[in-house]
Amino acid sequence: MLKETYHPNAYLANLRNVRRGLRARTKVLNALEKGSGDGKTIAQEAALHYSVVMHHLKLLRSEGIVKRADGKPSVWTLTGAGQKRLVNTD
């Protein structure tokens, strides 16, 4: 059985990490690595529903992984902690 790989920042410290959430956060983080954007753009890039993306963006913001810029529409970007990826050293 193949083990799924998730973005290292998809794991949350204060909440239970279930597979569906890890998958969604991985898609959101991968979309943000390509460039910042508003919730609608990120939802389209990640192929997720807008409300799912917004829920996970708020969770990631509470962990300090993403930040939201002021203005309409709000633009989401990765923070310094969000840009740091773990390197696999096999």
Regions from the language model: what does each represent?
Residues 48-61:
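Short amphipathic alpha-helical interaction segments
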Residues 2-27:
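Short alpha-helical segments that sit at the start of domains
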Residues 41-45:
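A short acidic, leucine-rich amphipathic alpha-helix
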Residues 33-38:
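Short capping segments at the starts of secondary-structure elements
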